[in-house]
Curated annotation (Swiss-Prot):
Phosphorylated. PANTHER family: SORTING NEXIN (PTHR45827), SORTING NEXIN-33 (PTHR45827:SF3). It comes from Mus musculus (Mouse). GO terms for molecular function: identical protein binding; phosphatidylinositol binding. It holds the Pfam family SH3_9. Homodimer (via BAR domain). Interacts with ADAM15. Interacts with FASLG. Interacts (via SH3 domain) with DNM1 and DNM2. Interacts with WASL. Interacts with FCHSD1 (via the F-BAR domain). Gene3D superfamilies: Arfaptin homology (AH) domain/BAR domain (1.20.1270.60), Phox-like domain (3.30.1520.10), SH3 Domains (2.30.30.40). Detected in brain (at protein level). Residues 1-61 form the SH3 domain. This is Sorting nexin-33.
Amino acid sequence: MALKGRALYDFHSENKEEISIQQDEELVIFSETSLDGWLQGQNSRGETGLFPASYVEIVRPGISTNHVDYSNSPAGSLGTQGSLYSSPSMASPARSGGGSGFLSNPGSFEDDDDDDWDDWDDGCTVVEEPLAGGLGTNGHPPLNLSYPGAYPNQHMAFRPKAPLERQDSLASAKRGSVVGRNLNRFSCFVRSGVEAFILGDVPMMAKIAETYSIEMGPRGPQWKANPHPFACSIEDPTKQTKFKGIKSYISYKLTPTHAGSPVYRRYKHFDWLYNRLLHKFTVISVPHLPEKQATGRFEEDFIEKRKRRLILWMDHMTSHPVLSQYEGFQHFLSCLDDKQWKMGKRRAEKDEMVGASFLLTFQIPTEHQDLQDVEDRVDTFKAFSKKMDDSVLQLSNVAAELVRKHVGGFRKEFQKLGSAFQAISHAFQMDPPFRSDALNNAISHTGRTYETVGEMFAEQPKHDLFQMLDTLSLYQGLLSNFPDIIHLQKGAFAKVKESQRMSDEGRMAQEEADGIRRRCRVVGFALQAEMNHFHQRRELDFKHMMQSYLRQQILFYQRVGQQLEKTLHMYDHL
């Protein structure tokens, strides 16, 4: 039942799923159950969407004091009754696609992947996974339920210091002895755990099993190359069934070059890996998986399209110096035994080095980098990525429109031209004494040739434009990751500047300010290494894309020319 509410503070939406509200604005709230600190409702302008639960109060009719106030509820709490990390039963609506309307998405849980995990894993492997692991890049549960959560499980729900040592943000703000925390708890800088890392609240681990090195290269910081490079092919998408044919799915054959045997994986296995990657690698642009669909998902064209895009996805994964070394990825590529698979799956889901803790795994160069120079480089890359994103979208739209013309308009026009030539040939046969069979046959053949050319145009996108669209789609996903990653670095810069100002004013020890600057260097080196890797891959991928497109275009028009030249020779000896 809809309830009336009142906005306690102003809130400005950052994406289409959220709506802006103003202080004292009257709201309609669809449900008083807060999930991950967000409510769904309607503002006074008739806009429907999400807004922070802590920014509103629910007004009960006739009882002015009896209302639910979320203003002290942290993001991730269920109203005033839940803790910071909800139990699995509370998280179930988000994972099942049911419950409140803003969580349901008919396109996210589709036939090929909506069955139980019993054929892959007989039980729930991480029952203590926090609800925060399901947060989206905007702080509320997105429709695809994918977010790199800052903390791995409920039992290490981010305890940076003992209770007596912990510096509460409000108390520390009053004392003015430490850098203030971001009051916007929905900021990805906060939710990712990077703020806590910068402020020194992420505890060092006694033993860190994995490390990733950054070194200085000719273009600045870069990831140290994988000492054991490899590739992986994806082949033979095969339709399989279970439950006596009631459910069906597509299985892909994966053959890594560094493993002895191929493995077979379904799309939902890829999806599991993808969410592990998002959960762990906070400052890395993880390539998006190709979309899944329910209607017609076993049609040949869709199967081929998904295969092409999974191949590109795998190519980017294996070429990334950090992602390719991830233990969960290696397990995904090589495990053949069911029992070992489940053990490795549980181990990946209980990984402690995720989110904020993942930043502890970096080994950075000793070279000094001026903070302003780094910020300038980040700003340049931000402008570049925005322009590239716009350009990729423009080229994608043009290429998609060209595909439609090839399949529809071009074929139709050439067929009309061919039919018109055929009509001329038939007309010439109407007066037998004056008809020329050789000429009529040549004109009729010309008509058939243009009909063939029309079919060639309809088939051509499979050889060039489809591959171009696949590459552009991959880069649209990669580019869409960078705004949040850059926001993390911007937040780190701000903390360094604030700490230095407080140190200059005598409100913070210089040693503490130096620690913040040192940890900011870690984030800065990681972002620059990721920017460097993106540029390297971009140059290779777009070179290959353009070469492939032009070669196929040349071959296509050569084939068209051969058809026309063959027809032309029929007129030589009339």
